[in-house]
Amino acid sequence: MARADDPDERKTQGGHGDRRRREFRGGEQVVRAGTLLLAATDLTEPTFRRSVVYIMEHNDSGSLGVVINRPSETSLADVLPRWSALAADPGTLYFGGPVKRDAALCLGTLKVGASTAGVPGLRRIDGRVVLVDLAADPERIAPLVEGIRVFAGYAGWTFGQLEGELDNEDWIVLSALPTDPISAARPDLWADVLRRQPLPMSLLATHPIEVERN
């Protein structure tokens, strides 16, 4: 599962060097930056149960992502007031994963047609989704984004670890929409993502939240 050791501290807000991008295929599954990992129905570990993970990085050093459906009760205005005006509803800090929960990562969704050229503090992950440097000037970024989401901590896998979990069918790999990282806190984003898939995958959305109650 997502690792808690962090030898290189995964400085996601800064530079990454020239790491070779790679993909893993397991059947029809493809993991790359910009895809979603949905917890399989039998993955019951509390940290990742019914979680939706947005993959930010996937290469020879391992994989890194943030859980995008775990809102906290902490208002972003209380911890990062400079960025609160850009925060998508509900405007709270999200729990991004079990690794380095004292560190913050920020994702944003660019407006259609917006360009990041010449704008410091934005790094494109995939399509309209960008990594936002929280040390940047929010006033320069505000005109370019539909919204941002700030995550405390992240989920990380060492090289080969995620592949093993995919072989074990712990995760479902799906395409992401540009707005997924900033989507409003709905009752069950996990089920919402599954409902938009073709049959028979969409049937998994009917899996009950509490199996033992049925």
UniProtKB/Swiss-Prot annotation:
Annotated TM spans: none
Region Disordered: start-end pairs: 1-24
Cellular component terms (Gene Ontology): cytosol
Gene3D superfamilies per the UniProt record, alphabetical: VC0467-like (3.40.1740.10)
Domain of life: Bacteria
One protein family per Pfam: DUF179
InterPro entries for the chain: AlgH-like
HAMAP family: UPF0301
Membership in a protein family: Belongs to the UPF0301 (AlgH) family.
Protein name per the record: UPF0301 protein NFA_55110
Organism of this sequence: Nocardia farcinica (strain IFM 10152)
